[in-house]
Amino acid sequence: MQACVLADRADCGIAHEGDADRALAVDRLRNIVDEDRIVAIEAISMKGTGDLARNTLVTTVMSNLGLRLTMKKHEIEIIQTQVGDRYVLEAMREGGYSLGGEQSGHIIFSQYATTGDGVLTGLQIAARMIQTGRSLAELASEMTVFPQVLINVPDVDKSRVDDAALQELVSQAAAEL
């Protein structure tokens, strides 16, 4: 897709996987615009139009630190869930939120759908480019992606995670970030 964007001098490229419930974009400079950046673009735009319910974005614990910092800069709250679009949707429904997404590509616009929809995501990206008159590269530059390593850690006793002292330490560390 990157080569096609360059060869065709396109403003962007948008790709979908098998069942098209996810989207990935490439800007005109051939940079991949991942789901964290896409959801950042959407949250900022929706806040500007008054469409970001309760001024809040729902995402998972796997989101990049850059997304959290960008949302903080734009005074947008973040609700984090465990990994999985079903948890994102559950939190959106419980809180009455309009936008949620996860790093794997599922982005949910509750105004239009109750599941991740890659075609809808692609249309939203195009709409933001048209509405703002900015390229995808310019829109994506709102967020800096920080290096990130995701490691699956087996956990036999999940009750240890609920320990109040541990939760306090996690909250303190998150506040420092």
Summary of predicted features, one role per range:
Residues Q2, A40, L166-V170:
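Short, well-ordered alpha-helical scaffold segments within catalytic/effector domains
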Residues N31-A53, Q82-G84:
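Short, acidic/small-residue loops that bind anionic groups at enzyme active sites
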Residues H16-G18, I32-R37, A113-G116:
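Short glycine/threonine-rich catalytic loop with a Thr-x-Gly-x-Asp
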Residues D21-I41, L67-R68:
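Short Gly/Thr/Asp-enriched flexible loops that form oxyanion-binding sites at enzyme active sites
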Residues E17-D19, L29, M62, S104:
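Anionic group-transfer/hydrolysis microenvironments
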Residues C12, T49-L177:
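Phosphate-binding and adjacent anionic-ligand microenvironments
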